[in-house]
Protein backbone atom coordinates (compact mmCIF):
# COMPACT_ATOMS: atom_id res chain seq x y z
CA UNK A 1 0.00 0.00 0.00
CA UNK A 2 2.78 2.47 0.89
CA UNK A 3 4.50 1.85 -2.45
CA UNK A 4 1.55 2.92 -4.60
CA UNK A 5 1.57 5.98 -6.85
CA UNK A 6 -0.51 9.03 -5.98
CA UNK A 7 -3.27 8.08 -8.40
CA UNK A 8 -3.30 4.50 -7.13
CA UNK A 9 -3.46 5.40 -3.44
CA UNK A 10 -6.05 8.09 -4.19
CA UNK A 11 -8.21 5.46 -5.92
CA UNK A 12 -7.75 3.11 -2.95
CA UNK A 13 -8.93 5.86 -0.60
CA UNK A 14 -11.92 6.64 -2.78
CA UNK A 15 -12.91 2.97 -3.05
CA UNK A 16 -12.59 2.47 0.70
CA UNK A 17 -9.75 -0.06 0.46
CA UNK A 18 -7.95 2.03 3.06
CA UNK A 19 -9.06 5.04 5.09
CA UNK A 20 -7.07 8.28 5.48
CA UNK A 21 -6.59 7.50 9.20
CA UNK A 22 -5.31 3.99 8.45
CA UNK A 23 -2.94 5.36 5.80
CA UNK A 24 -1.68 8.03 8.18
CA UNK A 25 -1.12 5.44 10.91
CA UNK A 26 0.84 3.22 8.52
CA UNK A 27 3.11 6.11 7.59
CA UNK A 28 3.57 7.04 11.25
CA UNK A 29 4.54 3.44 11.97
CA UNK A 30 7.08 3.57 9.12
CA UNK A 31 8.53 6.78 10.55
CA UNK A 32 9.00 5.06 13.92
CA UNK A 33 10.43 1.90 12.33
CA UNK A 34 12.95 3.94 10.32
CA UNK A 35 13.83 6.43 13.05
CA UNK A 36 17.46 5.30 12.75
CA UNK A 37 17.63 7.07 9.35
CA UNK A 38 17.25 10.43 11.15
CA UNK A 39 15.15 11.67 8.23
CA UNK A 40 12.82 13.72 10.43
CA UNK A 41 13.50 16.56 12.84
CA UNK A 42 9.87 16.90 13.93
CA UNK A 43 7.06 14.34 13.57
CA UNK A 44 3.63 15.98 13.76
CA UNK A 45 1.74 12.85 14.81
CA UNK A 46 -1.19 14.45 16.62
CA UNK A 47 -1.72 17.06 13.92
CA UNK A 48 -1.43 14.45 11.15
CA UNK A 49 -4.05 12.20 12.72
CA UNK A 50 -6.40 15.17 13.10
CA UNK A 51 -5.94 16.13 9.44
CA UNK A 52 -6.48 12.49 8.42
CA UNK A 53 -9.71 12.38 10.44
CA UNK A 54 -10.96 15.50 8.66
CA UNK A 55 -10.08 13.90 5.33
CA UNK A 56 -11.94 10.73 6.30
CA UNK A 57 -15.10 12.74 6.97
CA UNK A 58 -14.86 14.27 3.50
CA UNK A 59 -14.50 10.84 1.89
CA UNK A 60 -17.49 9.53 3.84
CA UNK A 61 -19.58 12.40 2.46
CA UNK A 62 -18.21 11.99 -1.07
CA UNK A 63 -16.70 15.47 -0.84
CA UNK A 64 -13.00 14.70 -1.18
CA UNK A 65 -10.93 17.67 -2.36
CA UNK A 66 -9.02 15.87 -5.10
CA UNK A 67 -6.27 13.37 -5.75
CA UNK A 68 -4.17 14.59 -2.78
CA UNK A 69 -6.91 14.40 -0.12
CA UNK A 70 -5.65 12.17 2.69
CA UNK A 71 -2.18 11.73 1.16
CA UNK A 72 0.74 11.91 3.65
CA UNK A 73 3.52 14.36 2.79
CA UNK A 74 6.59 15.79 4.51
CA UNK A 75 8.34 19.15 4.37
CA UNK A 76 12.00 20.12 4.60
CA UNK A 77 12.60 22.07 7.80
CA UNK A 78 13.47 25.31 6.03
CA UNK A 79 9.84 25.95 5.02
CA UNK A 80 7.68 27.88 7.47
CA UNK A 81 4.88 25.84 9.04
CA UNK A 82 2.30 27.58 11.23
CA UNK A 83 2.48 26.36 14.82
CA UNK A 84 5.28 23.88 14.05
CA UNK A 85 8.90 24.51 14.97
CA UNK A 86 11.01 25.45 11.94
CA UNK A 87 14.73 25.16 12.66
CA UNK A 88 16.74 24.98 9.41
CA UNK A 89 18.69 22.36 11.43
CA UNK A 90 20.43 25.23 13.23
CA UNK A 91 20.86 26.35 16.81
CA UNK A 92 19.98 29.81 15.52
CA UNK A 93 16.35 28.83 14.96
CA UNK A 94 15.81 26.16 17.60
CA UNK A 95 12.47 26.92 19.20
CA UNK A 96 11.31 29.23 16.41
CA UNK A 97 7.62 28.63 15.60
CA UNK A 98 6.37 30.58 12.55
CA UNK A 99 2.89 32.14 12.61
CA UNK A 100 2.19 31.22 8.96
CA UNK A 101 2.61 28.46 6.38
CA UNK A 102 4.84 28.70 3.34
CA UNK A 103 2.68 29.04 0.23
CA UNK A 104 3.66 25.58 -1.06
CA UNK A 105 2.77 24.00 2.29
CA UNK A 106 -0.57 25.81 2.40
CA UNK A 107 -1.41 24.72 -1.15
CA UNK A 108 -0.91 21.06 -0.24
CA UNK A 109 -2.94 21.43 2.95
CA UNK A 110 -5.71 23.12 0.97
CA UNK A 111 -5.88 19.99 -1.18
CA UNK A 112 -6.37 17.83 1.92
CA UNK A 113 -2.85 16.41 2.09
CA UNK A 114 -1.71 15.27 5.55
CA UNK A 115 1.51 16.74 6.99
CA UNK A 116 3.61 14.03 8.66
CA UNK A 117 6.51 16.20 9.80
CA UNK A 118 9.58 18.30 9.05
CA UNK A 119 12.61 16.65 7.48
CA UNK A 120 16.31 16.92 8.26
CA UNK A 121 18.89 18.89 6.26
CA UNK A 122 22.29 20.54 6.31
CA UNK A 123 22.27 23.67 8.46
CA UNK A 124 20.43 26.41 6.55
CA UNK A 125 20.56 24.09 3.50
CA UNK A 126 24.32 24.67 3.08
CA UNK A 127 25.74 21.31 2.12
CA UNK A 128 25.52 18.30 -0.17
CA UNK A 129 25.33 15.41 2.29
CA UNK A 130 22.75 16.30 4.96
CA UNK A 131 25.55 15.77 7.45
CA UNK A 132 26.07 19.26 8.91
CA UNK A 133 22.82 20.00 10.73
CA UNK A 134 22.61 20.19 14.52
CA UNK A 135 20.30 17.16 14.64
CA UNK A 136 22.89 14.83 13.14
CA UNK A 137 23.37 13.28 9.70
CA UNK A 138 20.71 11.59 7.60
CA UNK A 139 21.31 7.97 6.69
CA UNK A 140 20.62 6.84 3.14
CA UNK A 141 17.92 4.11 3.22
CA UNK A 142 19.85 2.19 0.55
CA UNK A 143 22.58 1.60 3.15
CA UNK A 144 20.33 -1.20 4.38
CA UNK A 145 19.38 -2.79 1.06
CA UNK A 146 20.38 -6.42 0.65
CA UNK A 147 22.19 -5.51 -2.57
CA UNK A 148 24.51 -3.05 -0.80
CA UNK A 149 24.98 -5.18 2.30
CA UNK A 150 25.84 -8.11 0.06
CA UNK A 151 28.15 -6.30 -2.36
CA UNK A 152 29.38 -3.00 -1.09
CA UNK A 153 29.61 -2.71 2.65
CA UNK A 154 32.81 -3.92 4.30
CA UNK A 155 31.01 -4.07 7.66
CA UNK A 156 28.19 -6.35 6.56
CA UNK A 157 29.72 -9.80 7.10
CA UNK A 158 27.65 -10.37 10.21
CA UNK A 159 23.88 -10.27 9.88
CA UNK A 160 23.43 -8.53 13.24
CA UNK A 161 25.89 -5.78 12.38
CA UNK A 162 25.05 -2.39 10.92
CA UNK A 163 26.57 -1.70 7.49
CA UNK A 164 28.92 1.18 6.78
CA UNK A 165 26.04 3.52 6.09
CA UNK A 166 25.87 5.97 3.21
CA UNK A 167 25.10 9.67 3.05
CA UNK A 168 21.69 10.60 1.67
CA UNK A 169 22.94 13.58 -0.31
CA UNK A 170 21.95 17.13 0.41
CA UNK A 171 20.81 19.41 1.43
CA UNK A 172 17.31 17.89 1.19
CA UNK A 173 18.54 14.49 2.37
CA UNK A 174 15.80 14.08 4.96
CA UNK A 175 13.10 14.60 2.35
CA UNK A 176 14.72 12.15 -0.08
CA UNK A 177 15.18 9.53 2.64
CA UNK A 178 11.59 10.02 3.84
CA UNK A 179 10.21 9.28 0.37
CA UNK A 180 12.61 6.41 -0.34
CA UNK A 181 11.76 4.79 3.01
CA UNK A 182 7.98 4.93 2.31
CA UNK A 183 7.22 7.22 5.28
CA UNK A 184 5.28 9.55 2.97
CA UNK A 185 4.26 9.75 -0.67
CA UNK A 186 5.62 13.23 -1.38
CA UNK A 187 8.19 15.50 0.23
CA UNK A 188 9.11 19.11 -0.36
CA UNK A 189 12.75 20.09 -0.61
CA UNK A 190 14.56 23.22 -1.71
CA UNK A 191 16.98 23.52 -4.62
CA UNK A 192 19.58 26.28 -4.82
CA UNK A 193 22.38 24.45 -6.62
CA UNK A 194 21.12 20.87 -6.69
CA UNK A 195 19.81 20.33 -3.17
CA UNK A 196 16.73 18.41 -4.35
CA UNK A 197 18.27 16.54 -7.28
CA UNK A 198 21.44 15.40 -5.53
CA UNK A 199 19.75 13.52 -2.65
CA UNK A 200 17.01 12.24 -4.97
CA UNK A 201 19.68 10.63 -7.15
CA UNK A 202 21.46 9.08 -4.15
CA UNK A 203 18.23 7.78 -2.60
CA UNK A 204 16.71 6.39 -5.79
CA UNK A 205 13.73 8.74 -6.09
CA UNK A 206 12.57 11.44 -8.51
CA UNK A 207 13.71 14.99 -7.75
CA UNK A 208 12.22 17.94 -9.64
CA UNK A 209 13.56 21.50 -9.68
CA UNK A 210 10.96 23.69 -11.41
CA UNK A 211 11.67 26.78 -13.48
CA UNK A 212 12.56 29.78 -11.32
CA UNK A 213 9.37 31.78 -10.79
CA UNK A 214 6.94 28.93 -11.49
CA UNK A 215 6.52 28.02 -7.80
CA UNK A 216 6.29 30.49 -4.91
CA UNK A 217 9.24 30.91 -2.55
CA UNK A 218 7.13 32.67 0.08
CA UNK A 219 7.85 31.00 3.41
CA UNK A 220 11.02 29.28 2.22
CA UNK A 221 13.75 30.61 4.50
CA UNK A 222 16.11 32.09 1.90
CA UNK A 223 19.61 30.97 1.06
CA UNK A 224 20.15 32.56 -2.37
CA UNK A 225 17.09 34.55 -3.44
CA UNK A 226 17.98 34.60 -7.12
CA UNK A 227 18.40 30.80 -7.32
CA UNK A 228 16.26 29.20 -4.57
CA UNK A 229 13.37 27.07 -5.83
CA UNK A 230 11.05 24.73 -3.89
CA UNK A 231 11.77 21.17 -5.01
CA UNK A 232 9.53 18.11 -5.27
CA UNK A 233 10.54 14.56 -4.30
CA UNK A 234 8.38 11.58 -5.26
CA UNK A 235 8.79 7.94 -6.23
CA UNK A 236 7.72 8.42 -9.86
CA UNK A 237 7.69 11.19 -12.47
CA UNK A 238 3.91 11.39 -12.81
CA UNK A 239 3.58 11.99 -9.06
CA UNK A 240 5.98 14.92 -9.39
CA UNK A 241 3.85 16.34 -12.21
CA UNK A 242 0.70 16.06 -10.07
CA UNK A 243 2.34 17.96 -7.22
CA UNK A 244 3.80 20.60 -9.53
CA UNK A 245 0.37 21.30 -11.01
CA UNK A 246 -0.91 22.03 -7.48
CA UNK A 247 2.05 24.22 -6.50
CA UNK A 248 2.64 26.18 -9.72
CA UNK A 249 1.27 29.63 -10.33
CA UNK A 250 1.40 33.27 -9.31
CA UNK A 251 1.58 34.17 -5.65
CA UNK A 252 0.97 37.82 -4.68
CA UNK A 253 3.30 37.23 -1.72
CA UNK A 254 6.21 36.42 -4.07
CA UNK A 255 6.86 39.06 -6.72
CA UNK A 256 9.18 36.73 -8.64
CA UNK A 257 6.40 34.28 -9.54
CA UNK A 258 4.96 34.30 -13.05
CA UNK A 259 1.88 36.40 -13.73
CA UNK A 260 0.56 34.19 -16.54
CA UNK A 261 -1.86 31.35 -15.94
CA UNK A 262 -0.08 27.99 -15.72
CA UNK A 263 -1.08 25.38 -18.30
CA UNK A 264 -2.28 21.95 -17.10
CA UNK A 265 0.59 19.53 -16.55
CA UNK A 266 -1.15 16.22 -17.28
CA UNK A 267 1.39 13.90 -18.91
CA UNK A 268 0.38 11.88 -21.99
CA UNK A 269 0.29 8.09 -21.63
CA UNK A 270 2.50 7.70 -24.70
CA UNK A 271 4.99 9.91 -26.51
CA UNK A 272 6.59 9.82 -29.95
CA UNK A 273 10.27 9.92 -29.06
CA UNK A 274 11.26 10.06 -32.74
CA UNK A 275 10.21 13.71 -32.87
CA UNK A 276 12.62 14.71 -30.10
CA UNK A 277 16.17 15.99 -30.14
CA UNK A 278 18.23 15.05 -27.07
CA UNK A 279 21.38 17.05 -26.36
CA UNK A 280 24.46 15.59 -24.66
CA UNK A 281 26.69 18.39 -23.28
CA UNK A 282 30.31 17.45 -23.96
CA UNK A 283 31.53 19.60 -21.05
CA UNK A 284 29.68 17.34 -18.60
CA UNK A 285 32.27 14.60 -19.07
CA UNK A 286 33.80 16.06 -15.97
CA UNK A 287 36.82 15.11 -13.91
CA UNK A 288 35.78 12.64 -11.24
CA UNK A 289 32.84 11.21 -13.19
CA UNK A 290 32.80 7.51 -12.36
CA UNK A 291 33.12 5.00 -15.18
CA UNK A 292 29.82 3.45 -14.10
CA UNK A 293 27.91 6.72 -14.25
CA UNK A 294 29.49 7.49 -17.63
CA UNK A 295 28.36 4.07 -18.88
CA UNK A 296 24.79 4.58 -17.64
CA UNK A 297 24.72 8.02 -19.29
CA UNK A 298 25.88 6.55 -22.61
CA UNK A 299 23.38 3.70 -22.32
CA UNK A 300 20.55 6.19 -21.75
CA UNK A 301 21.56 8.17 -24.84
CA UNK A 302 21.60 4.93 -26.85
CA UNK A 303 18.14 4.10 -25.51
CA UNK A 304 16.74 7.36 -26.88
CA UNK A 305 18.54 6.88 -30.17
CA UNK A 306 17.23 3.34 -30.62
CA UNK A 307 13.70 4.68 -30.02
CA UNK A 308 14.14 7.08 -32.93
CA UNK A 309 15.18 10.28 -31.17
CA UNK A 310 17.91 12.46 -32.61
CA UNK A 311 20.77 12.44 -30.10
CA UNK A 312 23.49 15.02 -30.66
CA UNK A 313 26.51 16.32 -28.79
CA UNK A 314 26.18 19.97 -27.79
CA UNK A 315 28.46 22.52 -26.17
CA UNK A 316 27.90 24.67 -23.09
CA UNK A 317 31.26 26.46 -23.36
CA UNK A 318 31.20 28.37 -20.06
CA UNK A 319 30.53 25.29 -17.92
CA UNK A 320 34.08 25.22 -16.57
CA UNK A 321 33.51 28.61 -14.91
CA UNK A 322 30.15 27.75 -13.38
CA UNK A 323 31.27 26.32 -10.01
CA UNK A 324 33.49 29.33 -9.22
CA UNK A 325 30.79 31.72 -10.41
CA UNK A 326 28.18 29.92 -8.32
CA UNK A 327 30.42 30.06 -5.23
CA UNK A 328 30.84 33.84 -5.48
CA UNK A 329 27.16 34.59 -6.08
CA UNK A 330 25.92 32.04 -3.56
CA UNK A 331 28.09 33.23 -0.69
CA UNK A 332 27.40 36.90 -1.46
CA UNK A 333 23.64 36.34 -1.14
CA UNK A 334 24.14 34.10 1.90
CA UNK A 335 26.02 36.92 3.65
CA UNK A 336 23.12 39.26 2.95
CA UNK A 337 20.39 36.80 3.95
CA UNK A 338 22.06 35.63 7.15
CA UNK A 339 22.36 39.23 8.39
CA UNK A 340 18.72 39.04 9.55
CA UNK A 341 19.65 36.52 12.26
CA UNK A 342 20.96 39.00 14.81
CA UNK A 343 19.32 37.85 18.05
CA UNK A 344 16.79 40.67 18.16
CA UNK A 345 13.55 39.72 16.41
CA UNK A 346 13.48 35.91 16.48
CA UNK A 347 15.65 32.88 16.90
CA UNK A 348 18.57 32.39 19.25
CA UNK A 349 19.91 35.24 21.39
CA UNK A 350 22.94 35.00 23.64
CA UNK A 351 22.06 35.67 27.27
CA UNK A 352 25.24 37.47 28.25
CA UNK A 353 25.03 40.97 29.72
CA UNK A 354 27.15 42.66 27.05
CA UNK A 355 26.93 45.55 24.60
CA UNK A 356 24.65 45.32 21.58
CA UNK A 357 27.52 44.71 19.17
CA UNK A 358 29.00 42.03 21.43
CA UNK A 359 25.56 40.43 21.68
CA UNK A 360 25.30 40.30 17.87
CA UNK A 361 28.70 38.62 17.61
CA UNK A 362 28.07 36.12 20.40
CA UNK A 363 24.61 35.24 19.08
CA UNK A 364 25.94 34.44 15.62
CA UNK A 365 28.92 32.56 17.01
CA UNK A 366 26.62 30.37 19.12
CA UNK A 367 23.84 30.10 16.54
CA UNK A 368 25.72 29.30 13.32
CA UNK A 369 28.05 26.38 12.65
CA UNK A 370 31.46 26.73 11.01
CA UNK A 371 30.06 26.09 7.52
CA UNK A 372 27.53 28.92 7.71
CA UNK A 373 30.01 31.34 9.28
CA UNK A 374 32.55 30.44 6.59
CA UNK A 375 30.12 31.22 3.79
CA UNK A 376 29.14 34.51 5.41
CA UNK A 377 32.83 35.44 5.65
CA UNK A 378 33.44 34.55 1.98
CA UNK A 379 30.38 36.46 0.84
CA UNK A 380 31.32 39.58 2.75
CA UNK A 381 34.82 39.41 1.23
CA UNK A 382 33.37 39.35 -2.30
CA UNK A 383 31.09 42.28 -1.45
CA UNK A 384 33.84 44.52 -0.08
CA UNK A 385 34.11 47.77 -2.03
CA UNK A 386 37.59 46.92 -3.29
CA UNK A 387 36.51 43.41 -4.42
CA UNK A 388 32.96 44.06 -5.66
CA UNK A 389 33.78 44.63 -9.34
CA UNK A 390 36.44 41.94 -9.56
CA UNK A 391 34.30 39.23 -7.99
CA UNK A 392 30.57 39.92 -7.66
CA UNK A 393 30.02 41.94 -10.84
CA UNK A 394 32.27 39.65 -12.87
CA UNK A 395 30.41 36.59 -11.55
CA UNK A 396 27.08 38.16 -12.55
CA UNK A 397 28.41 38.63 -16.08
CA UNK A 398 29.61 35.03 -16.24
CA UNK A 399 26.21 33.88 -14.97
CA UNK A 400 24.63 35.62 -17.96
CA UNK A 401 27.05 33.82 -20.31
CA UNK A 402 26.14 30.48 -18.71
CA UNK A 403 22.42 31.21 -19.17
CA UNK A 404 23.06 32.23 -22.78
CA UNK A 405 24.79 28.90 -23.43
CA UNK A 406 21.55 27.10 -22.57
CA UNK A 407 19.47 29.55 -24.62
CA UNK A 408 21.71 28.96 -27.65
CA UNK A 409 21.47 25.17 -27.35
CA UNK A 410 17.69 25.14 -26.97
CA UNK A 411 17.20 27.64 -29.81
CA UNK A 412 19.23 25.32 -32.08
CA UNK A 413 16.50 22.68 -31.94
CA UNK A 414 17.42 20.66 -28.86
CA UNK A 415 14.35 19.74 -26.79
CA UNK A 416 15.93 18.28 -23.65
CA UNK A 417 19.47 17.89 -22.32
CA UNK A 418 20.55 14.58 -20.78
CA UNK A 419 23.35 14.65 -18.18
CA UNK A 420 24.53 12.82 -15.06
CA UNK A 421 23.10 14.14 -11.79
CA UNK A 422 26.07 13.23 -9.59
CA UNK A 423 29.63 12.05 -10.18
CA UNK A 424 28.96 8.63 -8.65
CA UNK A 425 26.63 6.69 -6.41
CA UNK A 426 26.37 7.57 -2.71
CA UNK A 427 29.51 7.32 -0.60
CA UNK A 428 29.89 6.04 2.97
CA UNK A 429 29.57 8.69 5.67
CA UNK A 430 33.06 8.02 7.02
CA UNK A 431 34.52 8.69 3.58
CA UNK A 432 32.32 11.72 2.96
CA UNK A 433 33.45 13.60 6.08
CA UNK A 434 37.14 13.28 5.17
CA UNK A 435 36.67 16.37 2.98
CA UNK A 436 35.37 19.74 4.11
CA UNK A 437 31.89 21.00 3.23
CA UNK A 438 33.08 23.46 0.60
CA UNK A 439 35.14 20.88 -1.29
CA UNK A 440 32.35 18.31 -1.19
CA UNK A 441 29.73 20.80 -2.34
CA UNK A 442 31.88 21.89 -5.29
CA UNK A 443 32.20 18.25 -6.37
CA UNK A 444 28.58 17.31 -5.81
CA UNK A 445 27.08 20.43 -7.46
CA UNK A 446 29.13 20.16 -10.66
CA UNK A 447 26.22 18.97 -12.84
CA UNK A 448 23.38 20.75 -11.08
CA UNK A 449 24.18 24.36 -10.12
CA UNK A 450 24.37 25.78 -13.66
CA UNK A 451 20.65 25.03 -14.07
CA UNK A 452 19.87 27.22 -11.05
CA UNK A 453 21.94 30.09 -12.41
CA UNK A 454 20.05 29.82 -15.71
CA UNK A 455 16.66 29.47 -13.98
CA UNK A 456 15.76 26.33 -15.95
CA UNK A 457 13.75 23.25 -14.93
CA UNK A 458 15.51 19.94 -14.33
CA UNK A 459 14.53 16.53 -13.02
CA UNK A 460 16.61 13.57 -11.89
CA UNK A 461 15.29 10.07 -12.52
CA UNK A 462 16.72 6.81 -11.10
CA UNK A 463 18.45 5.16 -14.06
CA UNK A 464 20.25 2.06 -12.80
CA UNK A 465 21.95 0.38 -9.87
CA UNK A 466 25.71 0.48 -9.52
CA UNK A 467 27.89 -2.57 -8.90
CA UNK A 468 27.41 -1.88 -5.19
CA UNK A 469 23.64 -2.12 -5.66
CA UNK A 470 23.08 1.63 -5.20
CA UNK A 471 20.94 4.05 -7.23
CA UNK A 472 22.45 6.21 -9.96
CA UNK A 473 20.31 9.05 -11.28
CA UNK A 474 20.40 10.89 -14.59
CA UNK A 475 19.29 14.48 -15.08
CA UNK A 476 17.02 15.92 -17.75
CA UNK A 477 17.14 19.70 -18.34
CA UNK A 478 14.40 21.52 -20.23
CA UNK A 479 13.50 24.92 -21.59
CA UNK A 480 12.14 27.48 -19.13
CA UNK A 481 8.47 26.85 -18.30
CA UNK A 482 8.41 23.71 -20.48
CA UNK A 483 7.92 21.31 -17.57
CA UNK A 484 5.29 19.29 -19.40
CA UNK A 485 7.69 18.34 -22.19
CA UNK A 486 10.52 17.77 -19.72
CA UNK A 487 8.47 15.48 -17.49
CA UNK A 488 6.96 13.64 -20.47
CA UNK A 489 10.46 12.72 -21.65
CA UNK A 490 11.50 11.80 -18.10
CA UNK A 491 8.41 9.61 -17.70
CA UNK A 492 9.20 7.76 -20.93
CA UNK A 493 12.73 7.10 -19.72
CA UNK A 494 11.46 5.98 -16.32
CA UNK A 495 9.11 3.47 -17.93
CA UNK A 496 11.90 2.12 -20.12
CA UNK A 497 14.46 1.54 -17.35
CA UNK A 498 11.95 0.32 -14.72
CA UNK A 499 14.15 1.11 -11.72
CA UNK A 500 13.20 -1.06 -8.72
CA UNK A 501 12.14 0.63 -5.50
CA UNK A 502 13.86 -0.13 -2.21
CA UNK A 503 12.53 -3.25 -0.49
CA UNK A 504 10.36 -2.43 2.53
CA UNK A 505 11.47 -5.58 4.35
CA UNK A 506 15.14 -4.55 4.18
CA UNK A 507 14.42 -1.38 6.14
CA UNK A 508 12.27 -3.22 8.67
CA UNK A 509 15.11 -5.67 9.35
CA UNK A 510 17.59 -2.79 9.54
CA UNK A 511 15.39 -1.07 12.10
CA UNK A 512 15.47 -4.12 14.33
CA UNK A 513 19.27 -4.31 14.05
CA UNK A 514 19.58 -0.58 14.81
CA UNK A 515 17.33 -0.98 17.85
CA UNK A 516 19.47 -3.85 19.15
CA UNK A 517 22.63 -1.79 18.67
CA UNK A 518 21.08 1.16 20.50
CA UNK A 519 20.02 -1.10 23.35
CA UNK A 520 23.46 -2.71 23.64
CA UNK A 521 25.17 0.70 23.67
CA UNK A 522 22.86 2.01 26.41
CA UNK A 523 23.42 -1.13 28.51
CA UNK A 524 27.19 -0.96 28.21
From Swiss-Prot:
The active-site annotation reads 76, 171, 195
The answer on whether this UniProt entry bears the keyword Acetylation reads no
Q: Give the main EC class.
A: ligase
Q: Which cellular compartments is it found in?
A: Mitochondrion
- What EC number(s) has UniProt assigned to this enzyme? 6.3.5.7
Sum up the protein's function in the record's words.
Answer: Allows the formation of correctly charged Gln-tRNA(Gln) through the transamidation of misacylated Glu-tRNA(Gln) in the mitochondria. The reaction takes place in the presence of glutamine and ATP through an activated gamma-phospho-Glu-tRNA(Gln).
Query: What is the protein name for this chain?
Result: Glutamyl-tRNA(Gln) amidotransferase subunit A, mitochondrial
